[in-house]
From Swiss-Prot:
Extracellular topological segments: 1-67, 123-140, 203-227, 547-557
Cell compartments where the protein resides: Cell membrane
SS bond list: C138-C218
Designated name of the protein: Muscarinic acetylcholine receptor gar-3
Job description of the protein: The muscarinic acetylcholine receptor mediates various cellular responses, including inhibition of adenylate cyclase, breakdown of phosphoinositides and modulation of potassium channels through the action of G proteins. Primary transducing effect is Pi turnover. Enhances the release of the neurotransmitter acetlycholine in cholinergic motor neurons, which in turn positively feeds back to depolarize body wall muscles and allows for the maintenance of normal body posture and locomotion.
Keywords, alphabetical: Cell membrane, Disulfide bond, G-protein coupled receptor, Glycoprotein, Membrane, Receptor, Transducer, Transmembrane, Transmembrane helix
Organism: Caenorhabditis elegans
GO function term, MF aspect, one: G protein-coupled acetylcholine receptor activity
PROSITE patterns, sorted: G_PROTEIN_RECEP_F1_1, G_PROTEIN_RECEP_F1_2
Record bears the keyword Cell membrane: yes
Domain of life: Eukaryota
Membrane topology, as annotated: Multi-pass membrane protein
PANTHER family: 5-HYDROXYTRYPTAMINE RECEPTOR, MUSCARINIC ACETYLCHOLINE RECEPTOR DM1
């Protein structure tokens, strides 16, 4: 029975049946499952170190790529938006459209190109650790990268030169600094960068006759093959500009400190002079050294302020015009129809008084006693202009402090000097009106007097009216002079100096205050930009010079970080403007609030005064 069964199992016909094949399949499947279970059990008890390392390495590589992409995208976005805000601020705010800010605008253009092109491509190259975008795209990225980076450096150098000349040579440099010249200098920065980098990046493989860059890499070839060219470009692009910028910034800093000290001394001198002028007038005080210093100070102020004029000018009553012969004539303002208004006009013309401020009133009696300038004064009036003028009155002595005269007048004391107007072509006509200025300089203790020549008749008035007006004018002038002399204290006239220069000192103080404020803002901005530039660019240039002579000695991570640090400089620059310039901060806030329209002038002015 058993043999029969075995025989039947060995029968070839039985092996070909469907049942036998199913049994074999089941047996094989069970054995395979048992083997897999045993392997799985042994693997669980003793895990493989290689499999574990591979899994963690894969996860770490993916995490590293994600982190690099996120950081690079964040910096690219911040750099692009920050520099775009600088450009928009320059466009929408008229107060920011200055020549100095043109350089900042150019710097923002270079930085925004770095944020849009250079940072994203470098992020991609660093994340996948190979370059698979092709040779043409590699050359394009390198050319734009080095071009804009070097243009950014040269713009910083241009800003430093602009600040240096503005502080050290304000009178000669600022008037000649125009928008056209600024744009020319900005164009030069890009032209120099264009000559320095892109041609050599593209042509260097052909100059050497071979491509030495490894496949999957994107580098500047001469930075790897020629150490001398590498050092030369580093010196031209970084070391030389940063050295010049440091020297210029040091000079700007010391010049600013020097001006602040000089301004403090000037304020102290002006306060001391004002106190001295208010002291009582005594002969002993006039002979003292302190009074001589006051005289010297007042003469300098007078020479500086009134050296350009040689006539008695009254604000609102005398205006310079050109006649047909090319001479400059001083026409008196037209008088009104009423007789009282004419008298007041004559009185103002003779006394040099007007309804202006104390500064204008003081300027009315200010004269330059230089012979040449006085002799060239022209008072001839053509016949066609005579209906629009008021006649000068008869001679009236005008008190004038001797300490306010210039050195030319000091040499003519104890005598009288008559300065006549230069005859003009119309002087041959009897109808032309001329008058002279008579200055009498007496003893040291007395006051000199200024006299105007006799009045000419007013043509539109009848003879009786003319005579009456002249007598009224003379009487009113005498009364005016008598009342002024009685009201003056012994040293009251010494306050002419104070009245003359008070308004000017105030305006000069405000002007210098604004200049110091602008210089301080510019110095802060320059210092912040310079410090950020040195901190972000120094590591890369040190590594490049080291790698030129000692290749493959610096870790790749350190080289990548130093390269990316140069890009961060373009991110920091807009923040430097905002931190150091309140106007940029204000405009940034306007942009963030989407207020692109111009604000009311009163609001802008109030904001400027607060800052």
């Amino acid at each position: 029975m058993q043999s029969s069964s075995l025989g039947n199992a060995d029968d070839p016909r039985f092996r070909q049946t469907h049942l036998f094949q199913m049994l074999v399949k089941v047996i094989n499947t069970s054995a395979e499952n048992a083997t897999k279970t045993a392997i799985a059990t042994s693997s669980t008890s003793t895990p493989s170190f290689v499999d574990t390392y591979s899994t963690s390495s894969l996860l770490g590589e993916e995490g590293r790529m994600v982190m690099i992409v996120v950081i690079g995208a964040m910096f690219a976005l911040v750099t692009s938006l920050g520099n775009l805000m600088v450009m928009v601020s320059f466009k929408i705010d008229k107060q920011l459209q200055t020549i100095s800010n043109y350089f900042l605008f150019s710097l923002a253009v270079a930085d925004i190109a770095i944020g849009v092109i250079s940072i994203p491509m470098f992020t991609y190259y660093t994340a996948i650790q190979k370059w698979d975008l092709g040779y043409t795209m590699c050359q394009f990225w390198l050319c734009i990268d080095y071009l804009m980076s070097n243009a950014s450096v040269l713009n910083l150098l241009l800003i430093s030169f602009d600040r240096y000349f503005s502080v050290t040579r304000p009178l000669s440099y600022r008037p000649r600094r125009t928008t056209k010249k600024a744009l020319t200098m900005i164009a030069c920065t890009y032209i120099i960068s264009l000559i320095l980098w892109p041609p050599w990046i593209i042509s260097w493989p052909y100059i050497e006759g071979k491509f030495t860059a490894e496949p999957g890499t994107c580098v500047v070839q001469f930075l790897q093959t020629n150490p001398y060219v590498t050092v030369g470009t580093a010196v031209a692009a970084f070391y030389l500009p940063v050295t010049i910028m440091c020297i210029l910034y040091t000079r700007v800093y010391w010049e600013t400190q020097k001006r602040q000290k000089e301004f403090g001394k000037l304020q102290a001198t002006q306060t001391w002079a004002s106190d001295v002028v208010d002291r009582p007038s005594t002969q002993s005080f006039r002979n003292s050294k302190m009074w001589k210093k006051v005289k010297k100070f007042s003469r300098r102020s007078m020479k500086r302020d009134v050296s350009s004029t040689s006539i008695i000018k009254s604000s609102g009553s005398m205006r310079k015009k050109n006649n047909q012969d090319g001479y400059v004539e001083d026409s008196v303002t037209p008088c009104t129809s009423s007789r009282n208004s004419k008298r007041k006009s004559w009185l103002r013309n003779c006394t040099g008084k007007s309804n202006s401020s104390s500064e204008d009133s003081s300027e009315a009696v200010a004269m330059n006693l230089d012979d040449t300038s006085l002799s060239s004064s022209h008072f001839a009036l053509s016949g066609s202009r005579r209906r629009n003028i008021s006649p000068p009155c008869t001679p009236m002595p005008t008190n004038f402090e001797d300490e306010e005269q210039t050195d030319a007048g000091a040499s003519m004391r104890n005598g009288s000097a008559r300065f006549r107007s230069r005859p003009s072509d119309t002087g041959k006509n009897n109808n032309s009106d001329t008058y002279t200025v008579l200055i009498e300089l007496n003893d040291e203790g007395s006051r000199p007097s200024v006299r105007l020549s006799s009045c000419e008749p007013y043509l539109d008035e009848p003879i009786s009216t003319r005579n009456r007006s002249k007598s009224d004018c003379n009487s009113e002038i005498d009364e005016r002079r008598h009342s002024l002399l009685n009201k003056q204290s012994p040293f009251k006239n010494g306050r002419i100096l104070k009245n003359f220069s008070s308004q000017e000192r105030k305006s000069e103080k405000e002007q210098r205050k604004n200049e110091r404020k602008q210089e301080s803002k510019a110095a802060k901005t320059l210092s912040a930009i310079l410090c950020a530039f040195i901190a972000t660019w120094t590591p890369y240039n040190l590594i490049v010079c080291w790698e030129a002579f000692f290749p493959n000695t610096v870790p790749n991570v350190l080289w990548t970080f130093s390269y990316f640090l140069c890009y961060i400089n373009s991110t920091i620059n807009p923040l430097c403007y905002a931190l150091c310039n309140a106007r940029f901060r204000h405009t940034y806030m306007r942009i963030l609030r989407c207020k692109f329209k111009a604000e009311r002038p009163t609001m802008n002015q109030g904001y400027v005064r607060r800052n």
